């Protein structure tokens, strides 16, 4: 029995015990109390509505709290100028305008506090549009997300240019999010990936966006998830994320994509020491690159080695076994076959429901990554912590204080804030 009440009185709630109904479902207006003298378990001021269930049980009235998904208007607090700016970006983006997409990604990459707020408003609008489009597509994903990783010199950019041209010629719209490493000293980045894809960068059905890592580990940027969502909102049906190829720890992209592809050069021994169990376990497809000319024989040997190695690894999917193929971006050998295997992977994962479950899990990982980032930002900007950091750093440098004890002092100062 649904009822909408502003503030139910305590006597009204007690009177429900004498009612013949087994269950009432009430929705209350935003407040820190559910009614007179009935405080919430926590204030839900950020929510537009409260949702509370009162179950009439034999042992009396039992309250169950649950959070409604209806949130307050995300545009609350925006000036007219800011609202027009967000609306302009949103309208242009869903119409597929590349300039608006580029500006939107720049907005979400900004570290300015107000721009970050505007970015969240824009992302919420795009997310709602994205959900509507998926529903009209019978619940199927709008885009196929593919992560590419591999050691330096594996030929990732060369492969993407050949592969991307093939896809656009077949009628697909391709977005490439190329991540470039930032300098540890200056913080700068060359962003040279786009210059290595000259043909693809001129293709009107392809969009290449190089972004700096700015120190983010995992081979991706801080806002890669947001950029993926914006590209899908702009109508791109294949999203390629080329990661920083710097070793076995750089596979955070696997938590953002549908399929993780590992590109390996035809080399062995010390040259592949960084490509070990960790990243191999995450790969859905392994491609041995540069399989042409004098490198065909070593490429075949590496392929056989990894076919054997993959048999020993734990099975990650009930419907898909990782494949190892040889490709050449120079001759085109194996590229079409590789795309066929990628489509097979997508079809099998969709049919089994594993892809849907994987994306839901990725949303949870995305949320916790944002929480960690936000908590760290609040920690660094806390007045007491900011004041104590230089003093404690100096004591750690001269050996008067252990790093662990200094960290404990800062955490206690942060937790004891008013």
From Swiss-Prot:
Gene3D superfamilies: 1.10.287.130, 1.20.5.170, P-loop containing nucleotide triphosphate hydrolases. Homodimer. Interacts with MMUT (the apoenzyme form); the interaction is GTP dependent. Its EC number is 3.6.-.-. Changing residue 98 to G: In MACA; decreases protein levels; no effect on binding to GDP; decreases by 55% GTPase activity; abolishes interaction with MUT; impairs GTPase activity stimulation by MUT; highly reduces release of AdoCbl by MMAB. It is linked to Methylmalonic aciduria, cblA type: An autosomal recessive disorder of methylmalonate and cobalamin metabolism due to defective synthesis of adenosylcobalamin. Changing residue 207 to C: In MACA; decreases protein levels; no effect on binding to GDP; no effect on GTPase activity; abolishes interaction with MUT; impairs GTPase activity stimulation by MUT; highly reduces release of AdoCbl by MMAB. GO terms for cellular component: cytoplasm; cytosol; mitochondrial matrix; mitochondrion. Belongs to the SIMIBI class G3E GTPase family. ArgK/MeaB subfamily. Residues 1-65 form a transit peptide. GO terms for molecular function: GTP binding; GTPase activity; identical protein binding; molecular carrier activity; protein homodimerization activity. Changing residue 359 to Q: In MACA; decreases protein levels. It comes from the Eukaryota. GTPase activity is stimulated by MMUT. It is found in: Mitochondrion; Cytoplasm. It catalyses: GTP + H2O = GDP + phosphate + H(+). Changing residue 292 to V: In MACA; decreases protein levels; highly decreases binding to GDP; no effect on GTPase activity; abolishes interaction with MUT; impairs GTPase activity stimulation by MUT; highly reduces release of AdoCbl by MMAB. GTP binds at residues 150-158, 292, 328-330. The keyword 4Fe-4S does not apply. Its main location: mitochondrion. InterPro entries: GTPase_ArgK, P-loop_NTPase. Changing residue 276 to E: In MACA; decreases protein levels; no effect on binding to GDP; no effect on GTPase activity; no effect on interaction with MUT; impairs GTPase activity stimulation by MUT; reduces release of AdoCbl by MMAB. Changing residue 241 to F: In MACA; highly decreases protein levels; decreases protein stability. This is Methylmalonic aciduria type A protein, mitochondrial. GO terms for biological process: cobalamin metabolic process. Widely expressed. Highest expression is observed in liver and skeletal muscle. GTPase, binds and hydrolyzes GTP. Involved in intracellular vitamin B12 metabolism, mediates the transport of cobalamin (Cbl) into mitochondria for the final steps of adenosylcobalamin (AdoCbl) synthesis. Functions as a G-protein chaperone that assists AdoCbl cofactor delivery from MMAB to the methylmalonyl-CoA mutase (MMUT). Plays a dual role as both a protectase and a reactivase for MMUT. Protects MMUT from progressive inactivation by oxidation by decreasing the rate of the formation of the oxidized inactive cofactor hydroxocobalamin (OH2Cbl).
